[in-house]
């Protein structure tokens, strides 16, 4: 379950940012992240892990806003573009592998138009903390 490692990274990164900016007496109310579709992250598991890892910190109780970035592939040979959803039926058996190693999806894909294996992942592997919102703490 790599959702736990994502959640820990989110908490650690925001805590570092708070310290760096001298924001010691604040309560984080929202954390905004973008995560690629190819990571196959379960948003419920991610939120649960975030909730657990943020206990006792300024992030406790913060909303975790998750934007899932859709995948996009391009064939280097013919230029055709497509998404993960377009080829999901062919990849269904490999979902557990893709879940753990999203970068391997490139090795499992062929262009649906020309059948070339020269495929580039344009988007869908992101993990970005876009920002966070906070308010002054009364504590």
From Swiss-Prot:
UniProt-listed PROSITE patterns: HYPA
Name of this chain's protein: Hydrogenase maturation factor HypA
GO molecular function term, any single one: nickel cation binding
Role description: Involved in the maturation of [NiFe] hydrogenases. Required for nickel insertion into the metal center of the hydrogenase.
Native organism taxonomy: Archaea, Thermoproteota, Thermoprotei, Desulfurococcales, Desulfurococcaceae
Family stated for the protein in its record: Belongs to the HypA/HybF family.
Binding site for Zn(2+): 75, 78, 111, 114
Keywords for the protein's UniProt record, in alphabetical order: Metal-binding, Nickel, Zinc
HAMAP family: HypA_HybF
Pfam families xref list: HypA
UniProt source species: Ignicoccus hospitalis (strain KIN4/I / DSM 18386 / JCM 14125)
GO BP terms in the entry: protein maturation; protein modification process
Binding site for Ni(2+): 2
InterPro entries: Hydgase_Ni_incorp_HypA/HybF_CS, HypA/HybF
Residue stretches in coiled coil: none
